[in-house]
């Protein structure tokens, strides 16, 4: 966790999304789902600052280790780009899940991603005569023994606080001798420790769009949102509709949903989606071929899952490179989320009038 590393396929393009970013790099303000070019830009900024502060104004070497960089200001910050190996990650994920099954019944485990699970340990602590921290530590130690992989854990009185304890607190504390980081939160400690925490995007389910709306209304922290819910709740519902209810709950550290309820949930409707990041700007003819291929794959996905649909949605986001080709683009230009000028994204919806899974 002290290594500056991102998981991304650098052979594709610098616009590729990083599937993971280590805490060492996140500490410099790099997001967990940054694009590779963002990481490069931020590292260049960091190194410009390090060079100014280095003895003699120059580097004598480079390192990707956080502790070594902290001890040696004359070193340039490097980062490792590791190519994704999803088949291997899934295999190891299954191995780790099976270790958890030695302690926990499957109905009390909710796999959140390939490297993250929620566990409801409520009814196991008395059985094992352990505290929540001891129980988490025992499972992590078993995983380390069997796989050589250490872990970070968040413990909370609900699923939201577990996630926040891990994302914001555990990943930023000093590890023990085995590299393990464990943090705990309840509703009161959450308010005491994190109501003033910034940025808002560090919190689960608060993306750039939510943060931008909140900050435009002078709400910069979870404490601000909680106070607003007492004084001007209507504004939050006006901004976010029914989703304001969840935002308010989270601002106070509440989360009523449990693993049992997640597993019992049966959605009335389903949706499927697919997306592609192209290597370079495509002309209309080539882009149309890609869209048709995606439509074919979506159809096969519907058939495989036994689903039908009566609505299709297509979104196209254009790259800044489209503005570099001799002024051929004549449409509207907007700023993207990185502050760069780019053609305005396109959005279209088609209502079929009947349900179908056919092309």
Show where each model-derived region lies.
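Basic, low-complexity intrinsically disordered segments
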Residues: 1-359
């Amino acid at each position: 966790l002290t290594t500056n590393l991102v998981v991304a396929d650098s052979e594709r393009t610098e616009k590729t999304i990083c599937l993971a970013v280590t805490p060492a790099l996140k500490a410099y303000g790099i997001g967990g789902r940054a694009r590779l070019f963002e990481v490069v830009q931020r590292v260049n900024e960091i190194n410009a600052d390090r060079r100014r502060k280095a003895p003699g104004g120059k580097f004598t070497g480079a390192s990707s280790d956080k502790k070594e960089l902290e001890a040696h200001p004359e070193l340039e910050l490097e980062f490792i780009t590791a190519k994704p190996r999803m088949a291997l990650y899934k295999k190891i994920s299954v191995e780790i899940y099976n270790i958890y099954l030695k302690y926990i019944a499957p109905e009390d485990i909710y796999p959140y991603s390939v490297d993250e699970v929620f566990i409801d340990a409520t009814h196991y602590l008395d059985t094992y005569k352990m505290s929540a921290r001891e129980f988490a530590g025992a499972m992590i130690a078993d995983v380390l023994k069997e796989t050589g992989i250490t872990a970070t854990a968040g413990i909370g009185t609900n699923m939201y606080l577990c996630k926040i304890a891990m994302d914001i607190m555990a990943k930023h504390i000093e590890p023990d001798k085995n590299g393990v980081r464990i943090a705990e939160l309840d509703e009161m400690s959450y308010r005491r420790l994190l109501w003033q925490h910034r940025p808002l995007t560090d919190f689960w389910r608060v993306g750039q769009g939510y943060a931008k709306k909140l900050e435009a209304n002078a709400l910069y922290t979870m404490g601000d949102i909680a106070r607003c819910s007492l004084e001007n709740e209507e504004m939050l519902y006006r901004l976010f509709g029914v989703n304001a209810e969840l935002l308010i709950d989270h601002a106070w550290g509440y989360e009523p949903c449990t693993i049992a309820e997640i597993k019992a949930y049966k959605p009335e409707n389903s949706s499927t989606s697919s997306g592609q990041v192209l290597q370079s700007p495509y002309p209309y003819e080539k882009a149309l071929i890609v869209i048709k291929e995606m439509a074919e794959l979506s159809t096969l996905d519907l058939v495989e899952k036994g689903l039908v649909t009566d609505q299709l949605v297509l979104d196209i986001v254009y790259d800044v490179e489209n503005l570099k080709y001799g002024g051929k683009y004549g449409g509207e230009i907007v700023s993207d989320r990185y502050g760069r000028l780019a053609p305005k994204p396109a959005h279209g919806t088609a209502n079929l009038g009947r349900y179908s899974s056919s092309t």
